[in-house]
Amino acid sequence: MKKYLYFALAVLYACSPALAQDDYPTETDLYVFWQPDRPLTPADFQKSDSLSDRQKRISDAHALYCVGCFGLWTQADAPKGKWTRKRTEVVYIAPAFEKKSSFILHGDTAGIVHEQLLFDLQEVGARLLRYKLEEIKKEADRAAGIQAIVLNTCKAKVREFVDAMSSSFVAEVLIEKNDSLARWRALVDDYLEKYADYATRSEDCARFALNRPLLNGYSSIEALEADFRKRDSSGTYMIKQGPFPDTGTPVYKNGKRGRHVPPQSSENDIRKE
């Protein structure tokens, strides 16, 4: 009887990390974080009823009646104690859509297809950033802390690319009103497919939705010392920590709000080699 009990417990333990991922919130009441099975909907554009007359005139002048607000969020968390090659920083990246700054006028829900493409462009940026960080880590022989050190520099370069692509799309499709939407959709889809291995995970979204580190024994990094070898008297790395902005109340796939998700054990590190 005992061996069956041990077997059942072993199966439960092996499955628990995968099952826990179903509990990760991928949005809040304020933000939607990019996921392949979560397209934007009219309900996500929550500023529609609170636009000023000036904003409405600007939208009418350019015939832009569906406008989303997007961002590319990043956060690095690090062990509070000793770092090793397998216990090092964890970088989270997620495209974010801000509900209360996005609007639809005159019932132009058809415009959501354009905003979804712009949201997908943010996901292209997220994947390119992960790819670049991974390449740098390989070149540095997987040195602990290297991704956190170069994160902001790499993000700035990716940000330039995404902004340029987004501006070109808006100019061609939304301002000039030409027929290049299909070409743009194909271009973005090609990027998403090419970098499919670097897609935004539910863990990335949950890091921002829950607004705290997901791993036990980890804390948020605001900035690292330029010389990463610098340590305090106890031998641990010196990390400057700072508060993270309010991201709202987590919304779970089962419709519940604010349900607690316990931190993972560092043994189940999602970046484990």
Model-predicted regions and their roles:
Residues 7, 111, 125-127:
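A structural preference for long, well-packed, hydrophobic secondary-structure segments
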Residues 1-24:
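Bacterial Sec-dependent N-terminal signal peptides
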Residues 21-106, 119, 127-273:
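Extended, composition-driven regions rather than compact fold-specific motifs
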Residues 110-122:
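Active-site recognition of the HExxH zinc-binding catalytic motif
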